């Protein structure tokens, strides 16, 4: 962008050297970080100092025409000049979407205040999720250095705005399938109560009740996606059939594992609902998920699983009780 400046004759300023002008420029020129987009500026121009106004307008990169008539010059005191923003040194500003405009970008008066008057910017939109706050200029705009620390903890806190419905399973997963799916292993077919269609013939599968009633060694199926969220919830069990109770490995004592109190109470209530009088020992049954995370870093805390049991209703609990009460 090329601009031509026509310098008017200055009064009583011929003796100023170029170094003095450069020094006054460095005093009046704002640093690049403070150059903001100002839509309208009302300058206060003293009538007896027209040269000072020309220096300030020349420093800001704005060409304004000054007339010699005193009426027009006095009218400049109340006139609003719509200034044109000129990029210096070919600096490029990132374009900000219109829906994410924030008061901190056009704040000509109170940019020294600690907090801005506007609401905080939207961190998550339904379309883009966390990517809407990818730029640091968008995330921490309008904040001083003392406010950044609290804002970072507020944004990065994983307990903020966590929707538990993302852990919900589809309704079809609560019901036992008529035909075993690919995620159901052959060892697990015995646990399906109801009619199953195998080899073209319909027969009733009677579950084999081993001495270890509840299955252990929870196995995860392949990662599935439901409604856009990654679903890591368990789908199959590997039944641990042992003929000798002495041959079974001695489980670790519960005191050496991380235990969630809510999960343990929910597990005791579940065992009472399925007519099992005493809860099973640690590391047996669903309670071996109480280590909270598995080797791949996936959440295995049973708190979410028991919350799904409450939402699913009594149908799944009845099926679990029916699978135990069927005679061999």
Curated annotation (Swiss-Prot):
Q: Where is the composition biased (Polar residues)?
A: 178-200
Region Disordered, annotated ranges: 56-78, 108-135, 177-200
Which residues form each disulfide bond in the chain?
A: none
Q: What is the effect of changing residue 83 to A?
A: Abolishes binding to fbf-2
SUBUNIT field: Interacts with fbf-2; the interaction probably mediates the release of the C-terminal tail of fbf-2 from the RNA-binding domain, thereby altering its RNA-binding affinity.
The protein's job, in short, is: Plays a role in germline stem cell maintenance, perhaps acting in concert with mRNA-binding factor fbf-2. May regulate fbf-2 by modulating RNA-binding and perhaps by competition with the intramolecular interaction between the fbf-2 RNA-binding domain and C-terminal tail.
UniProt note: domains: Contains two Lys-Xaa-Xaa_Leu (KxxL) motifs, which are essential for the association with fbf-2.
Protein name in UniProt: Lateral signaling target 1 protein
Q: Which organism is it from?
A: Caenorhabditis elegans
Specify the taxonomic lineage.
Answer: Eukaryota, Metazoa, Ecdysozoa, Nematoda, Chromadorea
